[in-house]
From Swiss-Prot:
Enzyme class, spelled out: translocase
GO molecular function: NADH dehydrogenase activity; oxidoreductase activity, acting on NAD(P)H, quinone or similar compound as acceptor; quinone binding
The protein's assembly and partners: NDH is composed of at least 16 different subunits, 5 of which are encoded in the nucleus.
Task of the protein: NDH shuttles electrons from NAD(P)H:plastoquinone, via FMN and iron-sulfur (Fe-S) centers, to quinones in the photosynthetic chain and possibly in a chloroplast respiratory chain. The immediate electron acceptor for the enzyme in this species is believed to be plastoquinone. Couples the redox reaction to proton translocation, and thus conserves the redox energy in a proton gradient.
HAMAP family for this protein: NDH1_NuoH
Signal sequence extent: none
Species in which this protein is naturally found: Lepidium virginicum
GO cellular component term of the entry, any: chloroplast thylakoid membrane
Stated name of the protein: NAD(P)H-quinone oxidoreductase subunit 1, chloroplastic
InterPro entries referenced in this protein's UniProt entry, alphabetically: NADH_UbQ_OxRdtase_su1/FPO, NADH_UbQ_OxRdtase_su1_CS
GO BP annotations listed: aerobic respiration; photosynthesis, light reaction
Gene: ndhA
Amino acid sequence: MIIYATAVQTINSFVRLESLKEVYGLIWIFVPIFSLVLGIITGVLVIVWLEREISAGIQQRIGPEYAGPLGILQALADGTKLLFKENLRPSRGNTPLFSIGPSIAVISILLSYSVIPFSNHLVLADLNIGIFLWIAISSIAPIGLLMSGYGSNNKYSFLGGLRAAAQSISYEIPLTLCVLSISLLSNSLSTVDIVEAQSKYGFWGWNLWRQPIGFIIFLISSLAECERLPFDLPEAEEELIAGYQTEYSGIKFGLFYVASYLNLLISSLFVTVLYLGGWNISIPYISILELFQRDQIFGTTIGIFITLAKTYLFLFISIATRWTLPRLRMDQLLNLGWKFLLPISLGNLLLTTSFQLFSL
């Protein structure tokens, strides 16, 4: 009996140990995801505040100043207000499509953050096909917009959804060709490998200098993918009221609002990773890898700071562009994508391929 009791105690202790291992394993899985989501939310709140302050400066007026110091909590106050607003649904609309559309738009953009390297070895999923995964996932978002427009049973919403789909297709191809040119230069589809390939030559090793034409095309295409002025035709207020968002209210409207800024942030991060050297400080004789080897926490912190500094520099350009340029017509937008950007990006890809072949 004593031997039997001892065996039972041993088995129970083993089961408890395995249970603790499973709990710790789940914690190690969810902590990075939760940290990334929290960082993304904070980044979006900062972008909203920056846009309001920059737009106020451009228009020579006073921006938000009552919600928190310098109006920093204004975006949080607006989000809280949307949470408590009534969630309306069109009586003759397609309820499943109407409800699922915003979720598809947000989730497809959130998944793209998993392949962004914020610092050395600080990436949620270091995949060999990270860039390809981003392009594949980003092509899902227009489906959600089209579903929202169709499910609203509103001519303005449906036309906005069609415009969003047409605009996304028109500018997704030049953007993909620019990304392929970067992949050829780096000999990899991994975002981490692309950053490390630029770090070999410091500041002059950035793909911005090796691919200036591709950078300009990527810049224009990313703004069009984000549906920002001068490419905000899917939600042009003077023509379509609010486009595919016309029938939405409350939290679902808030999801579209958040999705637009999430898309802007992910585009800026990919500009940093693909063309601006990522987390590298790009100062001669100073390397993030050396700092990382000396002090891992300090090196990681510096890498995150450099990545975000480059990202918000591009965000400033995007925000200033919105408040300074007029909106294009639909025919001008499509002509720019199909007749100019597509041939130039294809020629840039062929030129890059030729250089890579001759350098072998």
